[in-house]
């Protein structure tokens, strides 16, 4: 790789700057939550911004000004509707370019350039980005199915800022994946005779990890949904119960751990070396760790008999 290309590939482009900023924000928030109770800032607005669902309803007194910005947590499905549509469109554009030689729409190519997508991406394999975009779309489709048919949402809330962030998040993730495609002008650039010639061992490993992580996340969501249903599958209440089974035996929020592993599987599919995607993974790590920590606190405060050996997010560690 030419020195100028290597420098461009390693530069802090706008896309990396966004993910680095989000990572720093979630890390700082997590560190603040880990402070001893007496040192933790008591700002109600701050706590309202970072909590959602059961961890929000556990707050003793929420000002009316905070409640004015509540959005039902069941609106989580909107995130995945947007993701399925948007990332499905991006996948269609990439498929057209890879297999039919059709150029990206000019507005999309311009947007990718603004975000920092570089020509040729330093030898990045087009197959890697294609597989990751497929994984992202399948993940979003499964999560949409779970929101509609598996999960049982109570009347708990999320902040409107969290809702807006969720809507933008999967749009940004999809653009991040597409920006890793090696480009020749407005067309995807394929090194070698065809796309399948780019197949590597890490593509197989990444696919296996994705399937494994997705299966565990689905199982954990089924366990959570069944806590509110009878044996016939009918919802009988919306109370919280202690979940057992699968990864719940090790951590309080295995669905968050599985989410992290899904993104790690995509990093593996990129061949381990994609710095931009590792910034995405790091953001997911601190984001999910924060949510898991708050959920762990909720469970321990609500249930006296909560298993002492369970960690919040990482088995045996945290």
From Swiss-Prot:
Broad EC category: oxidoreductase
GO MF annotation, one: polyprenol reductase activity
Keyword match Lipid metabolism: yes
PROSITE patterns xrefs: S5A_REDUCTASE
E.C. number(s) listed in UniProt: 1.3.1.94, 1.3.1.22
Residues exposed to the Cytoplasmic side: 1-11, 102-117, 179-194, 282-318
Signal peptide segment: none
Compartments reported by the entry: Endoplasmic reticulum membrane
Pathway: Protein modification; protein glycosylation
Positions in coiled-coil regions: none
Membrane topology (Lumenal): 35-80, 139-157, 216-260
Gene3D superfamilies per record: 1.20.120.1630
Membrane topology classification: Multi-pass membrane protein
Disease annotated for this entry: Congenital disorder of glycosylation 1Q: A form of congenital disorder of glycosylation, a multisystem disorder caused by a defect in glycoprotein biosynthesis and characterized by under-glycosylated serum glycoproteins. Congenital disorders of glycosylation result in a wide variety of clinical features, such as defects in the nervous system development, psychomotor retardation, dysmorphic features, hypotonia, coagulation disorders, and immunodeficiency.
Family: Belongs to the steroid 5-alpha reductase family. Polyprenal reductase subfamily.
Protein name, per record: Polyprenal reductase
